[in-house]
Design a protein with these regions (language model features):
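Active-site loop-to-helix "anion-binding N-cap" substructures in soluble metabolic enzymes
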Residues: 1-176
Length: 176
């Protein structure tokens, strides 16, 4: 309640797709909405590593939208081969399956976060992502969204960087 008239927005790190039922430890989208949450992260790499599938992520997106939340959909590859193109196919598959049954009006309410798992600070043998990597993937994500929803709709979707950033590179990511 104290945040209601502030410029601060509240977000949650996870959501459950069922509205109610015997799901101990899970928090529904409606419960998050009722306590004033605005945003919810869906499809984070750590959740995927625990077995969360694209189909479950799709259910979470739909549930979050129905409850009036703004979902932040994380997509990204676990490794990036220099020439194999596999990383592109991974992101295309994630978007295609996670956004199944999402309408043009609904996609405009979703934030897409590019989260390169290989660049996260918690990943063993990680290496740095560059603003160029993000720029390339942002263009690719926008193309996939254009294929799925049309250019005008795709251009209205917010795409952000969700990997490791620091004081030295944050400005470069913000300029993309």
């Amino acid at each position: 309640k104290q945040l209601k008239n502030k410029k601060i927005k509240l977000g949650a790190q996870n959501v459950f797709f069922e509205k109610n039922g015997a799901y101990t430890g899970e928090v529904s989208a409606q419960m998050l909405h009722d306590i004033g949450v605005d945003y919810v992260i869906v499809g984070h790499s750590e959740r995927r590593a625990m077995g969360e599938t694209n189909e479950i992520i799709n259910k979470k997106l739909i549930s979050s939208l129905k409850a009036g939340l703004i979902p932040i959909l994380c997509v990204g590859e676990s490794n990036r081969g220099a020439h194999d193109g596999f990383y592109l196919a991974t992101v295309r598959e994630q978007l295609s399956l996670c956004l199944a049954n999402i309408s043009k009006s609904q996609i405009k309410q979703i934030v897409v976060a590019y989260e390169p798992v290989w660049a996260l600070s918690s990943t063993p043998d990680r290496h740095d992502s560059t603003p160029h990597d993000f720029e390339e993937m942002k263009i690719y994500i926008r193309k996939i969204l254009t294929d799925m929803f049309g250019q005008a709709t795709a251009l209205s979707v917010c795409i952000i960087y969700g990997g490791s950033a620091n004081k030295d590179n944050a400005g470069s990511y913000l300029s993309i």
